[in-house]
Amino acid sequence: MSDISKYAGIFPAFYACYDKDGRISPEAVRALARYLLDKGVKGLYVGGSSGECIYHSVAERRLVLENVMAEVGGRLTVIAHVACNSTADSRELAAHAQALGVDAIAAIPPIYFKLPPRGIAKYWNDISDAAPDTDFIIYNIPQLAGVALTIPLLKEMQKNPRVVGVKNSSMPVQDIQMWRDEGVIVFNGTD
């Protein structure tokens, strides 16, 4: 397991940045990353809900992350959300994120079809395997993903040595304490 101290502090969700024509703006991405760095945040969570990840193509998601890393890579801890409806696309984004040097990747469970816990674990582990030198963070957002992280599923995922934490967007304080008691880092936020 990596040095988890790099995950202490404030990690804002990175918002989507567009130009006047509605396309990803590399300049605006870099400006926002620089602004957040200058404000003293410890890290960034890139490509999550606030980043409108589900609506972006793989190419757009790569472009955002490339520009974030070009601006703040090595100076901030960067977590890249890489989940897509396609496991292959998720794996591509995971490998790309690792190649760029992110600190961790994260993923929501598969959406639309509700998979059993073993199917969710396989999906997450397949993604994690595409970035074998990168930490993995489970993104728990049941109000949008349609499935909540359970302790048995968390324990199954903890068999993967790359799993270091949970990004919790489900809000109940009991969840935060429950997962912390299981020895994982918990990021909490509604994004």
What are these regions (language model features)?
Residues S2-G146:
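Active-site beta->alpha loop and helix N-cap motifs at the rims of alpha/beta catalytic domains
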Residues S128-P132, I141-D191:
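Catalytic alpha/beta core domains of metabolic enzymes, predominantly
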